[in-house]
Design a protein with these regions (language model features):
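Bacterial N-terminal signal peptides that target proteins for export
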Residues: 1-11
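C-terminal partner/receptor-binding element of secreted or periplasmic proteins
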Residues: 122-150
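Bacterial signal peptide processing site
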Residues: 23-25
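Residues immediately within or flanking Cys/His clusters that coordinate Zn2+
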Residues: 33
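Mature extracytoplasmic domains of secretory-pathway proteins
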Residues: 61-97, 104
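Post-signal-peptide N-terminal segment of Sec-exported extracytoplasmic proteins
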Residues: 37-75
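Short aromatic-glycine-(Arg/Gly/Cys) micro-motifs in beta-strand/loop hairpins
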Residues: 48-53, 101-113
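C-terminal motif of bacterial Sec signal peptides marking the signal peptidase cleavage site
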Residues: 18-21
């Protein structure tokens, strides 16, 4: 009778498949078709979109960072259930970056869809250029959440 136990190599293969399939990936936003999870408007502006991924892997998209902060702040999704926060890089429309490490400018020169008026940047140099062109206040993630909280 053949040995019915799997080989160690096949066990490692299936274990690695299981582990990697559970990993969080960067979300994608279907601009012009996706609906903001908070305000239900279509997500159209590639400079201001935002998204979260929960610990269970569910993706929520938002038309600006203010909607994302207010949605979680209102308790609709428990903050403890958010695995990753993302925002669109204002300098590279449609490209999602880590919201917790992004550099922000908040001011009326940045007319975001729901008037949070906050723009995210991947680099300090890009934020500096935006500040010179449009003005506003420099913020980090913690400060931005305080300004835009519900």
């Amino acid at each position: 009778m053949k040995n019915l136990l799997p080989s160690p190599i096949s066990l490692l293969f299936f274990l690695s498949l299981t582990l990697f399939s559970c990993g969080q990936t960067t979300p994608s936003i279907d601009f012009d078709h996706a609906e903001c999870a908070h305000c239900r408007m279509n997500v159209v502006d590639r400079q201001f979109g935002a998204a979260i991924i929960t610990l269970k892997g569910r993706q929520y998209v938002f038309d600006d960072v203010g909607c994302m902060i207010q949605h979680v702040g209102s308790g609709t999704i428990a903050e403890s259930q958010v695995a990753n926060w993302y925002v669109c890089d204002h300098a590279r429309p449609g490209v999602l970056i880590d919201a917790t490490t992004a550099r922000y400018v908040n001011g009326p020169g940045f007319r975001s869809p729901m008037r949070g008026d906050a723009a995210a940047f991947a680099t300090e140099a890009e934020r500096t250029i935006a500040l010179q062109e449009k003005g506003g206040e420099e913020l980090d993630w913690k400060q931005l959440r305080e300004v835009l909280k519900p």
